[in-house]
């Protein structure tokens, strides 16, 4: 009997809070644009949709539940993809602001950043110099002196809210220490397996994007958690597809989307997150890997609710 092929979960992060509207005309900003981008990504093979929101007037990241209200119902009506609402929001926001949409909408999945860190976006000023909105340049400049605050108390608070809402978490780990922070909460029985770890590579302030960095993260997670977790990786910027390919070959799930990279190939802007999902899906299928559906994702990782 032939062995069933491994199913790979594709997460798509369609807008995020890192890039700004002046960097790409394809970055979705309004609720309808974000919802439409998510629906197209799901149709291309993404089983998880990681969602941020933006002010529809100037594109600035926002955690206003009223803006999310214009995004979530449309996606749920058109797809069966798993909704993953950010609790990271933007490093410029308070933890209380960041938690609001997940608290209100009680999604089946939410992201949770597993440690405080420097969050350097200012190198993008070397590539982009003209901005339509004042906040865009300010956000990048201020990241020279910015700590993305995720203390143990912050993490515990978000975990408790998630538990009360039957929300599970995608644990975003930007460095090796974040895996140890996760282990701390597992040892305190505040997190139960199986859990979903998103390893983030190539963001200034976190772990690098060298193949050895990827393997170090994998070896450490295996040692700490054994078979109790699903591993996913994302590479920031130019590292997106290279790391997705390397990770998939090592047993990882993958994440793509315009939150993580504006590009589809060197020097060419991606016209949609769907394009990136399609590209990574083609890579995975060349490896003879199956693409997970939302149903198979649920089977692989966690029970799901139907709150949003």
Language-model regions, residue ranges each:
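Active-site beta->alpha loop and helix N-cap motifs at the rims of alpha/beta catalytic domains
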Residues: 68-72, 76-147
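Active-site mouth loops of central-metabolism enzymes
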Residues: 18-33, 88-92, 146-148, 232-233
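Conserved, mostly hydrophobic/aromatic
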Residues: 34, 52, 110, 182, ...
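Catalytic alpha/beta core domains of metabolic enzymes, predominantly
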Residues: 113-246, 250-257
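Alpha-helix-loop-beta-strand connector modules within alpha/beta enzyme cores
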Residues: 61-85, 220-226, 280
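N-terminal small/glycine-rich loop or linker at the start of catalytic domains
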Residues: 2-26
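Glycine-rich, proline-tolerant flexible connector loops at the mouths of alpha/beta enzymes
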Residues: 48-68, 201, 263-265
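Conserved small/polar residues in nucleotide/adenosyl-binding loops
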Residues: 298-303
